[in-house]
């Protein structure tokens, strides 16, 4: 019986810590005069190690991944690095692999944009760094690190492929995809 109580207490503590971590993502994100609402958030884990937490912010929350990918409207994905094991090269490599998955192996169609992405993500990555990938209609995907603009990549097609890393039918993490589409900040 005490073993069960210990497990329940550990789970309760974990739930509180996870709730607090997601609270750091914030329930909304202000872009200019527009306010985006947190659609859902989750954690990317690999081999039992939490790599980052990510939140999807939309003007009008929805669970329809295809509608989100196709939408030519303001939206954002926020990624907060939670592991000290993430480096610049591993982040870039992971995004490239995710783009290959998202595009069904047709990432070479976005060679120029991927080259731009590598140049934009030039700074080393540290634990607690926050990346915002903000899509602005007619202006492209703006990439911010810790609130500072790093660069932008033009095109709705690239936004679809990039957001597809998390939201396509072949995402980097199916549980994370489900969490980002859940309408809940905590899974």
Locate predicted features:
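Bacterial N-terminal signal peptides that target proteins for export
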Residues: 1-8
């Amino acid at each position: 019986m005490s073993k069960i109580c210990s497990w329940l207490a550990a789970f309760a503590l974990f739930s509180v810590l996870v709730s607090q971590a997601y609270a750091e993502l914030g329930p909304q994100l202000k872009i200019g005069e527009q306010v985006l609402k947190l659609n859902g958030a989750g954690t990317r884990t690999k081999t039992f190690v939490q790599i980052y937490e990510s939140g999807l912010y939309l003007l009008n929350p929805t669970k329809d991944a295809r509608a989100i990918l196709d939408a030519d409207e303001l939206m954002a994905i926020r990624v907060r690095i939670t592991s000290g094991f993430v480096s610049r090269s591993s982040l870039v490599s992971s995004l490239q692999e995710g783009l290959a998955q998202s595009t069904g192996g047709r990432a070479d169609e976005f060679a120029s944009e991927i080259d731009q992405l590598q140049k934009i993500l030039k700074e080393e990555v540290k634990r607690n760094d926050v990346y915002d990938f903000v899509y602005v209609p007619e202006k492209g995907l703006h990439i911010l690190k810790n609130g500072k603009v790093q660069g932008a990549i033009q095109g709705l097609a690239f936004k679809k492929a990039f957001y597809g890393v998390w939201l396509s039918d072949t995402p980097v993490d199916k549980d994370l995809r489900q969490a980002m589409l859940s309408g809940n900040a905590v899974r």
